């Protein structure tokens, strides 16, 4: 989904805006509406991407809390970033890229980035071992 979002935002929308900028006055209105439609597709994809990312992180957080392989706060951090990311997806769907949507989404995504780095560090340190495995059998 993120790839589709980047394709719409970085390629299709730029093409539409460039076409609008270069068009003669008689064609500008139609191209404006076409560019606006592409922008609405971008908003829809961004909304779904936020919902999906937030849901995934939240479910990982729950799994980390249940599993107990890693510190409890790692699972909590996933949920602290995941839930507002889902909320941002709902806000983006209803208000577009509004100030409110960005005020929710940007800090939540920053938390998820921190969470991913922390979880990666925890997994690296544990070497993939389960707490109930003998040290001699742990993978390095």
Language-model region placement:
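Hydrophobic, aromatic-enriched alpha-helical segments typical of multi-pass transmembrane helices
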Residues: 1-140
């Amino acid at each position: 989904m993120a790839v589709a979002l980047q394709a719409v935002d970085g390629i299709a929308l730029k093409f539409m805006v460039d076409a609008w900028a270069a068009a003669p006055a008689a064609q500008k209105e139609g191209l404006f509406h076409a560019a606006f439609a592409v922008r609405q597709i971008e908003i829809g994809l961004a909304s779904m991407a936020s919902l999906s990312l937030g849901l995934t992180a939240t479910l990982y957080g729950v799994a980390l809390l249940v599993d107990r392989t890693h510190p409890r706060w790692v699972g909590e951090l996933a949920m602290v970033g995941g839930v507002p990311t889902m909320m941002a997806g709902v806000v983006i769907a209803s208000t577009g890229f509004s100030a409110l949507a960005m005020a929710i989404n940007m800090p939540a995504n920053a938390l998820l980035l921190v969470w991913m780095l922390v979880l990666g560090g925890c997994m690296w340190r544990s070497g993939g071992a389960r707490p109930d495995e003998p040290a001699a059998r742990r993978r390095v």
